[in-house]
Amino acid sequence: MIIARSIAGIFPPATMGLTRWGLVALFLAIILFPHVRQHVAGIRTEWRSLALLGGLGMGLCGAPIYLAGTVTTATNIGLIYAVCPLIILTFSAYVFSISIKLGQLAGLIAGLCGVLVIIIKGDVSVITAMQFNGGDLLVVMGTLAFAVYSVGLKQVKTTLPPLLRLGVMAFFGAVWHLPFVAYEIFIQHNIVTLTPQIFGVAFILVFVASLGAYLSFGVVVSELGATRAGTILFLSPVYNAVLAVTLLGEVLAQYHFVGLALILPGLWLANR
């Protein structure tokens, strides 16, 4: 979300998505190449499901979100994404008949309220003054796609190691961006200019937002399930607040503590 807003108008959305997942796929291909041969049969068997998961988790959660960052606010993006754990719970319950405890639901609602308090900075008028546009629909699409991707990570069985599975999905995620990159280059004539900022953004996207975040999330999903793993998303505004204090010298406000007082018990309830 922060990256999407910070590079709006500098890094074309589809090009950024292709760069992100293309570099992830290339990096993993290099370090995993000696081990790929023994998993060729598994890749051939699972490539359709991996292509779908890559399209959902890396494709629809890539360029559309970056494009949305050029036309909507970080607050709007944050508010819409905050609902993702509840979507994961609903999808798990109604599509895969996964039983949901009342305590889990209560925890998710409490966590959602805590996230909202932090995002709107404790000011309800922020919500009433919000204006929605087409960019918000892109965020909704990306949020739904990530929710389905999260559930699919657990429900779609695999024989591949986590890193190799991520690498194959990243490859398909990059492929999904190709038609839109062609549109940016040949129709819009929107070509990225290489600058130190672009290289910095690419590094963060590849090693932090992709390899680190997606691999960790995938492992948690495999161990705890999508519903419990989805509650991790509630900690995003907490991480942002801590980083803002330590790196930018910002000061914690009362709404941070109110939000945290709702998020932490919510996480406890949701993961009982």
Where are these regions (language model features)?
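Membrane-interface helix termini and inter-helical loops of multi-pass transporters
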Residues: 2-13, 70, 119-132, 183-197, ...
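Hydrophobic/aromatic residues within transmembrane alpha-helices
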Residues: 7, 16, 20, 68, ...
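Hydrophobic alpha-helical transmembrane segments of multi-pass integral membrane proteins
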Residues: 14-31, 52, 103-117, 134-141, ...
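A helix-boundary/kink motif common to multi-pass secondary transporters
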Residues: 12-13, 73, 99-100, 161-162, ...
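Specific transmembrane alpha-helical segments of multi-pass solute transporters/efflux pumps
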Residues: 1-3, 29-81, 117, 206-224
